[in-house]
């Protein structure tokens, strides 16, 4: 419909308010969609326009890996009470211990190198330069954590989620080894690759054995 406000066609007060409301709603909706993921997934689509995209690569790596680790820890904590197989609970305890330790180290480095230890929340985690959506498909979101609380059989759902989650962490860690500047962070990336590949191999074996 075409409406002229300053022409021969005059709008009544009520239609004018409706038009203005629609315009304001569209503007605010577009802004919120680019600035926050809300209840959706990781904010991949605007990585190129994000102010953090011009940050040093090590900072971007920390800002990706910390919330990525938090997702793994959150899911592993659920496994402590829901897992059927005791070996999966043992793995979950290991994930919680190792990744919480790595989160602490990365936050300390971020504060020392970039003035703050604050990293994005899990649902606003962004891709690293050089990563594509396939690499980040395993990124954990709050909705995934919620679904895991009722998944059945839990152990299969856990393995099917944690394997690609580890794979995406390895992809990011390899980029850190290639493009990072701080040797201690590159060394941590090597640890992530080695430890999580070992866990992937174990989880894949369990998946085949328990759910052929």
Residue ranges and their predicted role:
Residues 3-16:
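Bacterial N-terminal signal peptides that target proteins for export
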Residues 29-212:
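All-alpha RGS (Regulator of G-protein Signaling) helical domain and cognate RGS-like helical scaffolds
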Residues 23-26:
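C-terminal motif of bacterial Sec signal peptides marking the signal peptidase cleavage site
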């Amino acid at each position: 419909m075409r409406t002229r406000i300053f022409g021969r066609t005059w709008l009544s007060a009520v239609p004018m308010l409706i038009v203005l409301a629609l315009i304001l709603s569209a503007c605010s909706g577009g802004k919120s969609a680019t600035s926050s993921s809300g209840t959706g997934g990781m904010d991949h689509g605007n990585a190129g326009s994000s102010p953090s995209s011009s940050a040093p690569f090590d900072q971007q790596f920390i800002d990706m890996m910390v919330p990525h680790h938090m997702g793994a820890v959150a899911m592993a904590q659920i496994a402590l009470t829901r897992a059927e197989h005791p070996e999966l609970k043992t793995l979950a305890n290991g994930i919680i211990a190792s990744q919480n330790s790595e989160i602490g180290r990365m936050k300390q480095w971020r504060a020392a190198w970039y003035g703050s230890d604050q990293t994005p929340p899990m649902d606003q985690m962004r891709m690293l330069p050089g990563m594509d959506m396939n690499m980040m498909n395993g990124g954990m979101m709050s909705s995934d954590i919620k679904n895991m609380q009722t998944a059945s059989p839990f152990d299969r759902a856990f393995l099917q989620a944690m394997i690609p989650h580890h794979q995406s962490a390895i992809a990011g860690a390899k980029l850190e080894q290639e493009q990072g500047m701080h040797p201690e962070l590159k060394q941590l990336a090597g640890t992530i690759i080695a430890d999580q590949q070992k866990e992937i191999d174990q989880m894949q074996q369990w998946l085949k054995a328990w759910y052929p």
